Structure formats: structure tokens, C-alpha cells
């Protein structure tokens, strides 16, 4: 009995601790916004790459979430598919900017990152 109780406690603590590791949608959006500002103000490729890498991770994590406006919708609904597609676009744009940053092209990476704002604004209009 004691061993099974300990096992249950161990499993439940793992479940709750893993849930706390995953950032919620709002946290991911904040990470994207904060790091976009870093990209805009950066003066070297290392800063740009670091910020874009954080943005990419946040976008991929946010893609798994459901925005409040779509709560109750099926994961296969057209709206949810479009929401996730927006993150596919965003990740592609981040990858394009990251490629430029990896080549040391800071100004070009910053210019490419400007597209992120257009995507953000379009999808915020739909789902925020």
C-alpha cells in the first residue's frame, strides 16, 4: 500500500511539474515580443541569433496552445488549423532571418524580421 501511494505521488508530481515547464500562450507571446525588440536593437549576429532562437522555440510552443477566442473549438476546426498555420508562417520567417544571422548579415536579418510584425498583426486581428 505504501509503495503504491509513493508511486502515485511520484507520477502526479511529474505530471504537475511537466505542466509548469510548458509556457502558456501569453508567456510565449511575451517571449516573442521581447525578443523581437532585441532583434531590432541588436548590433551583432550573436544577439540576433540568440533572440531568434528563443522566438522560434516560443512560436513552436505557442502553436500547441488554444487562444481564448477559440476555446471550445475542435483541434481540427478550420479556425484552429488557420491559427496553427500562422505559426508555421512565423517559424518560416524566423528561420529565414536566422539563416541570415548565421551568415553574419545582421542588417538583412533585422529587415527579414520586420515581416514578423505583419504576420503578428494579421493573426492578432483574427485570434486575439
Swiss-Prot record:
One of its GO terms (molecular function) is heme binding. Its cofactor is heme b. InterPro entries: Cyt_b562, Cyt_c/b562. It comes from the Bacteria. Keywords: Electron transport, Heme, Iron, Metal-binding, Periplasm, Signal, Transport. Pfam families: Cytochrom_B562 (PF07361). Its main location: periplasm. Binds 1 heme b (iron(II)-protoporphyrin IX) group per molecule. One of its GO terms (cellular component) is periplasmic space. Monomer. Belongs to the cytochrome b562 family. This is Soluble cytochrome b562. It comes from Escherichia coli O6:H1 (strain CFT073 / ATCC 700928 / UPEC).
Amino acid at each position: 500500500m505504501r509503495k503504491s501511494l509513493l508511486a502515485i505521488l511520484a507520477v502526479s508530481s511529474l505530471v504537475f511539474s511537466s505542466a509548469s515547464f510548458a509556457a502558456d500562450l501569453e508567456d510565449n507571446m511575451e517571449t516573442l515580443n521581447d525578443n523581437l525588440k532585441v532583434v531590432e536593437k541588436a548590433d551583432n549576429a550573436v544577439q540576433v541569433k540568440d533572440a531568434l532562437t528563443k522566438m522560434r522555440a516560443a512560436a513552436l510552443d505557442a502553436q500547441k496552445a488554444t487562444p481564448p477566442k477559440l476555446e471550445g473549438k475542435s483541434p481540427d476546426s478550420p479556425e484552429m488549423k488557420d491559427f496553427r498555420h500562422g505559426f508555421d508562417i512565423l517559424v518560416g520567417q524566423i528561420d529565414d532571418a536566422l539563416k541570415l544571422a548565421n551568415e553574419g548579415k545582421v542588417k538583412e536579418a533585422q529587415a527579414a524580421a520586420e515581416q514578423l510584425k505583419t504576420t503578428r498583426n494579421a493573426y492578432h486581428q483574427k485570434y486575439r
